[in-house]
Amino acid sequence: MFAELQRRRESGRVFEKHAFATLRDLFRWGMRGADGYQQLAETGYMLLAERTRHARDAETVRDVLQQVMRVHIDPEALYDRADTLAAQLGPERLAALQSAAQHHRIVWTSAMRRLVCLTAAALQQNEPVLLVGETGAGKTSVCDIVATAFGRPLH
C-alpha cells in the first residue's frame, strides 16, 4: 500500500510535495483495528484520502486501496451507512452521537455525518483533530455533538 502510494506520488506529483501519507499515518491506521478487508480499506480511506486537499489525490488513494485490497469503496455512501458508523465508533457511541444530535437539533446532512464520523473516530483513538473550514460549515456544532456524546469538553 505504502509503496504503491509512494510510486504514484513520484510519477504523477500526487499529494504535492509534503502532503503524502507518512509511516505515522499507517501506524495510526493499524491501531484503529478492523473486521475484514472492507472495513480496513474504509478506515484507510478515512485516514488518508480525507486529509488530502485535492479530489484527484483522494481518488488516487481510493484507487490504490481498491487495487491492493480488492474491495470497492464508495465515498458518497461511506458515511451514510449505519454499519460504517457503528464499525468505526461502536454501537453505543453511535447511539450517543445520534442522541446528542437530536438534543442539539442537528440535521444529519451527508456533510455533517462525514464530519462527525471523522472527528469522533479520531477522538475515540485519542488523536488530535483540527477543524478548518468556512464559516457555517458546522465545526462548532460537531464539537458540541461529540463533546456531549463523549462526555468530555473539547478545546
Regions found by a protein language model. Give the residues of each.
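Alpha-helical lid/collar subdomain of P-loop NTPases
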Residues: 1-117, 121, 125
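Walker A/P-loop
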Residues: 124, 128-155
